[in-house]
Amino acid sequence: MSNAREIRSKVQSVKNTQKITGAMELVAASKMRGAIVKMNNVRPYVESANTIIKNVTMASIDYPNPYLFDREVKRVGYIVTSTDRGLCGGLNINLFKHVLKDIKKNLDDRVEVDVCAIGSKAATFFAKLIDVNVVATAHYNDKDNEGSIRAIRGALKVMLDRFTNGEIDRLYMSSNQFVSTIKQKPKLQTLLPIQDIFSKEELKTNKEQASKGHWDYIYERDIEEVLNALCIRYIEAQVRGAILENAACEQAARMMAMKNATDNASDIIDQLKLDYNKVRQAMITQELAEICSGAAAV
């Protein structure tokens, strides 16, 4: 058993760590509130983009846009959104496990895989995988929002160009979904081809509405230019929304991880204090025994 001085030193060390984790919990809680505001602010834009792209796509169903229609799948791409920092529990590893299941299915079907990694954790993880080709990386920094958006647009352009050129035949995005402060879950969604996103019921409904003239658009220029630009904006909106939602998930997961660490530190301190009292009691008992033995010898 450790002596009393060692135990006191351990108690002080754990208390210092507890102060750090407590402060990190408060910082994460503050950042989480800001991240949730950003996430909620971008959602109406993403939903509007969804509605517009569905309507325009159905009204232009005969236009051969490369982003719209299925083709034989020989190679797929994944945009994986992770964090740049750790200390957020199992947020990243749960996401990687989720996307790896889908990647493994494609590899088993002899479909090659390209990855665009957003966040240093994803870049490091997928760089170690032999069967996966990392073609682009980017980072999101909430302190440099404009710079981060430019970097992410550059990485996204790499994937879009590969899809347009026929180098990949399908594009997915993997990120975390914010369910609540204490729950975040990984999700995988299709970005391209766009028609894969629509259910059969949506396709049927939109075709009927378009044929009946329930809605229509007047194009300032030709439909080709408008639809190409709109598809790119739609995909950028999806990625931007996923990144902001993932940022909220990161701060929520970090807050809970630091709270658990702070609570565990309290349990460790209580146990160390109990050990200290046992050692101190044993020392007192030993001293009393020595005094009694000395008195008996006299």
Swiss-Prot record:
PANTHER family: ATP SYNTHASE GAMMA CHAIN (PTHR11693), ATP SYNTHASE SUBUNIT GAMMA, MITOCHONDRIAL (PTHR11693:SF22)
Protein keywords: ATP synthesis, Cell inner membrane, Cell membrane, CF(1), Hydrogen ion transport, Ion transport, Membrane, Transport
Family to which this protein belongs: Belongs to the ATPase gamma chain family.
Swiss-Prot/TrEMBL GO biological process terms: proton motive force-driven plasma membrane ATP synthesis
Cell location: Cell inner membrane
PROSITE patterns the UniProt entry points to: ATPASE_GAMMA
Top-rank lineage group of the source organism: Bacteria
Gene that encodes the chain: atpG
UniProt-listed HAMAP family: ATP_synth_gamma_bact (MF_00815)
Signal peptide coordinates: none
GO cellular component terms, semicolon-separated: plasma membrane; proton-transporting ATP synthase complex
Subunit architecture: F-type ATPases have 2 components, CF(1) - the catalytic core - and CF(0) - the membrane proton channel. CF(1) has five subunits: alpha(3), beta(3), gamma(1), delta(1), epsilon(1). CF(0) has three main subunits: a, b and c.
Name of this chain's protein: ATP synthase gamma chain
Main function: Produces ATP from ADP in the presence of a proton gradient across the membrane. The gamma chain is believed to be important in regulating ATPase activity and the flow of protons through the CF(0) complex.
Record's bilayer topology term: Peripheral membrane protein
Statement: the UniProt record of this protein carries the keyword Transit peptide: no
Tagged with keyword Heme: no
MF annotations from Gene Ontology: ATP binding; proton-transporting ATP synthase activity, rotational mechanism
